Design a protein with these regions (language model features):
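N-terminal capping/linker segments that flank leucine-rich repeat
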Residues: 1-92, 109, 151
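Conserved hydrophobic beta-strand positions in leucine-rich repeat
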Residues: 72-74, 91-95, 112-116, 133-137, ...
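Consensus "Asn ladder" position of solenoid repeat domains
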Residues: 77, 95-98, 116-119, 140, ...
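Canonical leucine-rich repeat
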Residues: 82, 103, 124-126, 145-147, ...
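Conserved, compact domain cores that house catalytic/ligand-binding motifs in diverse enzymes
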Residues: 85-120, 127, 138
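Leucine-rich repeat
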Residues: 87-90, 108-111, 127-132, 148-153, ...
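Short, intrinsically disordered, charge-balanced linker/junction segments flanking boundaries
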Residues: 200, 206-209
Length: 209
């Protein structure tokens, strides 16, 4: 069940000092109402590759974004903790190059895109995210990656982790799988009828179906 906009929010903690700046792009479902940012003061907008991003000055090391957030871009902000559990409308999160060790997306049933490369995540459970189409979680410390049993997943990038197993049964729409530089011993692709690209080198694979 979706929560109302009064309780919808995303929060995170950063290792950056008060007075330093962070850069974010926040999209919300209700275009007429801007999300409220607590813990950081808006300074200016900048443009990157045709997209508008906001530069904010930290007034606290804990930042709360209130509103019906549909997409959050929050890369390279020294984030140590992030809470997405109160963002039921979230369809996309881009959290690359932070220091995040845990990402709970169990309540984000609308999520179609998750990018969290270059963090410290060890367990990533995506069983609730059946609408997920794009996953990129390269260069973490992931030893357990659980994909939804039946999903819309097209692209999965999970290289440079600590995976020993990778269950991709039920991923019958998967087109690209990059899982190199792990410790995977067995890979069963029999249900991946749409698979176009596979990169699984630098593992310990003894059985490939």
């Amino acid at each position: 069940p979706h929560q109302n906009s009064a309780t919808e929010h995303i929060s995170f903690e950063t290792a950056k000092a008060i007075g330093e700046t962070i850069t974010m792009r926040i999209e919300n479902k209700a275009k007429q109402s801007k999300p409220i940012v607590e813990g950081a003061t808006f300074l200016k907008e900048i443009e990157r590759e045709g997209e508008q991003y906001g530069v904010y000055e930290l007034t606290s090391q804990q930042v709360v974004i209130k509103g019906n957030i549909s997409f959050l871009y929050c890369e390279r902000n020294n984030i140590t903790k992030v809470d997405l559990t109160h963002a039921a409308t979230l369809w996309g999160a881009q959290l690359n190059e932070n220091q995040i060790s845990e990402i709970d997306v169990s309540n984000n049933v609308e999520l179609t895109q998750l990018r969290c490369d270059d963090n410290k995540v060890s367990i990533l459970d995506l069983t609730s995210n059946s609408k997920l189409r794009w996953l990129s979680c390269n260069n973490n410390q992931i030893r357990q990656l659980t994909l939804p049993k039946k999903s819309e997943l097209l692209v999965a990038y999970c290289s440079f982790n600590k995976l020993t197993t990778l269950d991709i049964s039920g991923q019958n729409k998967l087109e690209d799988l990059f899982c190199f530089d792990n410790k995977i011993s067995r890979l069963d692709l029999t249900q991946c009828a749409e698979l176009l690209t596979l990169a699984c080198h630098n593992n310990v694979i003894s059985e490939l179906k």
